[in-house]
A protein has these predicted regions:
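Pyridoxal 5′-phosphate
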Residues: 1-228
Length: 228
């Protein structure tokens, strides 16, 4: 619903009691500035298909360096061996064979969790991310956020006039703004939005909008006109 945790306060509370903190940052990464180290979290992860503008199949995992030695990998794969030297006897000259050399040392980086060859869809997404991440970095998450906030504030101001209740905190600065109205799915709102070619996330009694740099105030006004 757009609520944002004070992660530093959460982490301080958890760490004082010996607990570790995992943060799902899928609605943060790429949508607004976020310093994963300053937040204090021990783990953070996100997909690439939302605000990073990628697709399904790849994601990102952050693990605080001091926590890495405490982890156990569930699956072992050859990407996790930092010095793998594979030799396949059928393709080597006579006498050239030597044993495969490898070492599964202690965890030192993200490769500790990688399992093996990426699937075709993941490879395609990797190519897509090489472009989308450059685009997001060039724009800058702070600029993306600054562009979006006036759009969200306008929505928070106007949508309640149509019988909705805003369930997003009024000072939220994230990428989503949500509204609730009982019986929304059975009303004429979904039909009106579809006719106006306005695409939002609709539930039975709620809807969520996620404006970004590819939207402007004209899009907001078109959405409001479709509601009325």
């Amino acid at each position: 619903n757009g609520f944002q945790h004070d992660l530093k306060a959460v982490c301080d509370l958890a760490h004082d009691r010996g607990a570790l903190v995992y943060a799902d940052i899928v609605h943060t990464a790429g949508a607004e500035p976020f310093d994963v180290k300053a937040s204090g979290v021990d783990f953070a992860a996100c997909s690439s298909f939302k605000w990073l503008m990628g697709d399904f199949g790849l994601g990102f995992l952050y693990v605080k360096e001091s926590v890495l030695p405490r982890l156990t990998r569930p699956v072992v794969g050859y990407y996790q061996a930092p010095n793998l030297d594979a030799n396949y006897p059928p393709n080597l000259p006579t006498g050239a064979y030597r044993p495969v050399e490898y070492s599964y040392g202690p965890p030192t980086a993200a490769s500790y969790f990688e399992m093996g060859t990426l699937t075709g869809s993941a490879m395609a997404n990797l190519a897509l991310l090489s472009s989308s991440l450059s685009y997001v970095k060039a724009l800058g998450p702070a600029n993306i956020q600054a562009h979006r906030i006036p759009l969200i504030r306008r929505l928070q101001q106007e949508v309640p006039r149509f019988g909705f209740v805003s369930v997003t905190p009024p000072d939220a600065t994230g990428g989503n703004v949500s509204f609730a109205r009982k019986g929304l799915a059975d009303s004429d709102v979904p039909r009106r939005l579809a006719a106006a070619k306005v695409n939002v996330r609709l539930g039975r009694d709620w809807m969520r909008l996620s404006p970004s740099v590819y939207n402007d105030m004209g899009d907001v006004e078109r959405f409001l006109a479709a509601l009325g």
